[in-house]
C-alpha cells in the first residue's frame, strides 16, 4: 500500500512508516481490505484533509510525519499513552523544519484549524527543537485543547 495517496500530498505509507517498528520487527501496516483497518484509514484521511493538507497548502512547504498510525504493540514500544489517538489514526506528530517555521505553523493551526489536541512537544527540557502533535476526533467533537510546551521525558 506504499502508493495509496489519501490526499494530494499525503500517502498511507507516511503514516505507517516507523523506524522503531522496523528495528523491533513490529508489523505496523494497514490493509484497506481488512474491515478493522478501514476505519483507521478513514480517520487518517480525515486528519489529512482537515488538518495537514490545509497546513501544507497554506505555507507551501512539505509537512513531514514523524509519527502517525501506531498499532498497539508499537504504541507500547514507544511509550505512548494507553489511550493514544495514534492507535486510531486520529493523531500525527509532524517534524518542523526549524523553530521559527514551527512557531508559525503552530500559531496558524491554533487560529485556523478545528482540532482535538494541538501540542508543541519536545523530548527533554534541554532539547532545542520541538515537533507538533495534532489530533482530530473521528466523532467530530473537537476540544481545541492546546498545550504549548509539553516535555516528553521529564527525567532528562
Task: Enumerate the predicted regions with their spans.
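Short, polar loop/linker segments at the starts of domains and inter-domain junctions
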Residues: 29-30, 80, 145
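Extracytoplasmic cell-surface/polysaccharide-interacting catalytic and binding patches
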Residues: 1-56, 150-156
